[in-house]
Structure formats: C-alpha cells, structure tokens
Regions:
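Short amphipathic alpha-helical segments and helix-helix/interface helices
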Residues: 24-28, 70-71, 106-107, 122
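Structured helix-beta-strand junction loops
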Residues: 33-34, 76-77, 128
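Active-site neighborhoods of divalent-metal-dependent phosphate/nucleic-acid chemistry enzymes
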Residues: 78-116, 121
C-alpha cells in the first residue's frame, strides 16, 4: 500500500475536484482504502482556513463550511492527520533554511513518516530532489 504526504494546495484542489490525473488517481485509491494520504495538521488547517475565506482555487470558488471540508478530507475522506512529534521537529530544524515554513513541515513529515512521495505543486520541493507527485 502506498503512502503519501499531501500539502494544503493538493487538499484544496481535491476539494474542488480539479486534481491532475496522477494526483487524482492517488486520492481515488485513498478513497477506496488502497493508499494512505497523510497531511500535517498545519496543512489541513491552511486548507480549512481557505474554505472559511471562500478562496478561489483553480477558478472554482470554495463554498461550504470549514467543518464540511474537514469531514470531506478527514472525517469521511481519504486523508489522515500526520503526527507532528519530536522526529518531525528534528527533521524540520535540519531543513528549515531551505524552505518556507509550510514546505519545510511537509518535507519533514514526509521524511519522518517515510511516505513514498509528496503530493504537491511546489517547484521548490521538486527542485530539491524530493519525490513529488502532481501531474
């Protein structure tokens, strides 16, 4: 069973159903229980914050409540909350200078949890050699 770390953007794009093919396939597998998608709580909070502010994602305006989005992602959805414990923090402080605050936590979680890849659009993560999935 594959395991992946998702960033906030991928969660938002999932909510508006506009994921690119490979990322959509992974989320579909997770919905079927065949793959695990994890996201640090901060990535989930960023996505829920965007829902609360009716942010536009890929030309689609987010509607609904943060609670409905939480249910769609975690409650009844394909995403689980990745722990942020000492191991993640140890990895975070080692890489924080190479990334912004959000990307550093995504990469640290990916490393600590040993996931197969990161579901993200971020070019900075891709350019540093971490396995990413988007297209």
């Amino acid at each position: 069973m594959g395991t992946y770390t998702a960033d906030a953007v991928s969660l938002l794009v999932y909510l508006v159903d506009t994921l690119p093919q490979r990322a959509d396939q992974i989320f579909t597998e997770a919905e079927a229980g065949e793959t695990v998608i994890q996201a640090p709580s901060t990535a989930l909070v960023e996505a829920l914050y965007s829902v609360a502010r009716d942010k536009n994602v890929r030309g689609v305006t987010l509607t609904g409540t943060p609670e409905a989005a939480r249910q769609a992602l975690v409650g009844n959805g394909p995403v689980s909350v990745a722990p942020v414990a000492d191991e993640e923090l140890i990895r975070y402080v080692r890489i924080v200078d190479a990334f912004n605050i959000h990307d550093a936590l995504i990469v640290a979680s990916h490393q600590a949890q040993g996931t197969d890849a990161i579901i993200a659009t971020d070019g900075v993560i891709q350019e540093t050699g971490f396995e990413t999935v988007w297209k």
